Amino acid sequence: MIVGAGGGADMNARGAMGRYGETLAARRLTGAGMTVLERNWRCGRTGEIDIVARDGDVLVVCEVKTRRGGAFEHPMAAVTPDKAERLRRLAERWIQTHGGAPPGGVRIDLVGVLLPQRGAPVVEHARGVA
């Protein structure tokens, strides 16, 4: 492990921050009436879906981005065209391994979590981002 190059305590802190953001995101989604089906679903080297949920008869694949206040990039700006394509591929794989598409289809959402220096976290949910 090389300290200062993304390893060690910094990596643990980022992982903990990401998990905290995903917990806040799951609460936001369930508070909006969705059912969380799975968290951190991995598909080999293809990647991971942060949250898989159901919104009525729609399957929701949700990317969660958590940032500290003052970070360079706002969390809602984090879904690039490449990331959107990867999420679509992951959604297809999840559907294949879980019995097919639901009647309402699939939607890709983004939850951005901003953790300010002081005060409560800010959680934003954008539907149908990709």
Curated annotation (Swiss-Prot):
Check the record and name the SUPFAM superfamilies matching this protein.
Restriction endonuclease-like
CDD domains hit by this protein = PoNe_Nuclease
One MF term in the entry's GO annotations: nucleic acid binding
Q: Where are the transmembrane segments?
A: none
InterPro entries from the entry? Restrct_endonuc-II-like (IPR011335), tRNA_endonuc-like_dom_sf (IPR011856), UPF0102_YraN-like (IPR003509)
| Taxonomy, superkingdom | Bacteria
Please state which protein family the record places this protein in.
Answer: Belongs to the UPF0102 family.
The name this protein goes by in its record: UPF0102 protein SCO5602
Q: Which organism is it from?
A: Streptomyces coelicolor (strain ATCC BAA-471 / A3(2) / M145)
Q: What is the lineage of its organism?
A: Bacteria, Bacillati, Actinomycetota, Actinomycetes, Kitasatosporales
